Amino acid sequence: MPNIKIFSGSSHQDLSQKIADRLGLELGKVVTKKFSNQETCVEIDESVRGEDVYIVQSGCGEINDSLMELLIMINACKIASASRVTAVIPCFPYARQDKKDKSRSPISAKLVANMLSIAGADHIITMDLHASQIQGFFDIPVDNLYAEPTVLKWIRENIPEWKNCIIVSPDAGGAKRVTSIADQLNVDFALIHKERKKANEVDCIVLVGDVNDRVAILVDDMADTCVTICLAADKLLSAGATRVYAILTHGIFSGPAISRINTACFEAVVVTNTIPQDEKMKHCSKIRVIDISMILAEAIRRTHNGESVSYLFSHVPL
C-alpha cells in the first residue's frame, strides 16, 4: 500500500509486528530511549512527509511511560508533516476513569482524549472501550472495534458443548455484551450482581439465571486483579454449572491475579492479545490467547483506503 507507514511503540511490539506482517509492510524505524533523568526521547528515523501514519501502542505495562511515548511519537510525526496520524490503541489507558464517581474525582479518560488530540492525533482506533461513551470525549473520529466476532469463533471451535452453554456477565454493566453474544449463539444468558464497597474488593454476589447442568462462560471486557471473576466462577459451580470458562478482551492480570486464576475452578481463561500475555502464560497454564491482529490490520487497511470499517463489527477478516 502506498503512502502508509506503521510505527510501533515499546508496549506491545509483537502485536505491531503481526499487524505489519498481515498488511505486507515493514515497521517504520523509530528509536526510543530514556535520558538519565527518565525523560522519554523518541526519534522517528525515516521520512513521514505526506504519509498516512499509524502508531500502535497499547495501554499496558508501565502505562504512564507508554502513554507519554505515544504522545511524543504522535507529535513527532505531526510536526514532520505527516498527512494524517492515527493512534492505534488496542487497550485504551485510563478507560475506567470515565466519570465522576465521587466529589472531586477526575475524569482521566477525558484528559487522555484531550492529550491525544493536542499531541496531533487525527484519528483513534481502539478495541472494546470499557465505556463506549469515551468516544464522545474526542473531537476527532474514533473507531471502537469489537473482539466479539473472534470470541464467537473461539467458542464455536473450542467448546464442544457450546450449544448447551450459558453466557454470564460478571456485573450489570456487561449485560448488553453478553446478551449480544447469547443471541448470536442462540443460548441463554445470566447475570451476576455484585456489591462493591471499595475498588477491587467485592462484598457479595448474587446470581440471576439458571446455570444448572450447563457450561458457563463468563464474558467481560477486562480483568485486572481477577477478584470478581474468581468469585463468580465459584458461584457458578456452586449453582450447578458443569464447567466454567472466562473470556475477556483485555487481560491486565495485575497483582495476585495469576495465582488467583491458578487456584480458581476455571477450565480456561481466554483473553485477546491487546496486552502481551507471554510472560503470564508461563506462570498459568489456564490462559488461552485469541489473536486480534487481523481485525486491527483490516481496520488500518480500510481506513487508509477510505472504506467502511463497520463490517468488522460482526465479521472476522480472513
From Swiss-Prot:
InterPro entries: PRib_PP_synth_CS, Pribosyltran_N, PRibTrfase_dom, PRTase-like, Rib-P_diPkinase, Rib-P_diPkinase_bac. One of its GO terms (cellular component) is ribose phosphate diphosphokinase complex. PROSITE patterns: PRPP_SYNTHASE. Homodimer. The active form is probably a hexamer composed of 3 homodimers. Belongs to the ribose-phosphate pyrophosphokinase family. Keywords: ATP-binding, Kinase, Magnesium, Metal-binding, Nucleotide biosynthesis, Nucleotide-binding, Transferase. Its EC number is 2.7.6.1. PANTHER family: RIBOSE-PHOSPHATE DIPHOSPHOKINASE FAMILY MEMBER, RIBOSE-PHOSPHATE PYROPHOSPHOKINASE 3. The gene is PRPS1L1. Testis. ATP binds at R96, Q97, D98, K99, K100, D101, H130. The keyword Transferase applies. Residues 212-227 are annotated as: Binding of phosphoribosylpyrophosphate. Transmembrane segments: none annotated. Mg(2+) binds at D128, H130, D139, D143. This is Ribose-phosphate pyrophosphokinase 3. Pfam families: Pribosyl_synth, Pribosyltran_N. It catalyses: D-ribose 5-phosphate + ATP = 5-phospho-alpha-D-ribose 1-diphosphate + AMP + H(+). Pathway: Metabolic intermediate biosynthesis; 5-phospho-alpha-D-ribose 1-diphosphate biosynthesis; 5-phospho-alpha-D-ribose 1-diphosphate from D-ribose 5-phosphate (route I): step 1/1. GO terms for biological process: 5-phosphoribose 1-diphosphate biosynthetic process; male gonad development; purine nucleotide biosynthetic process; ribonucleoside monophosphate biosynthetic process. The keyword Hydrolase does not apply.
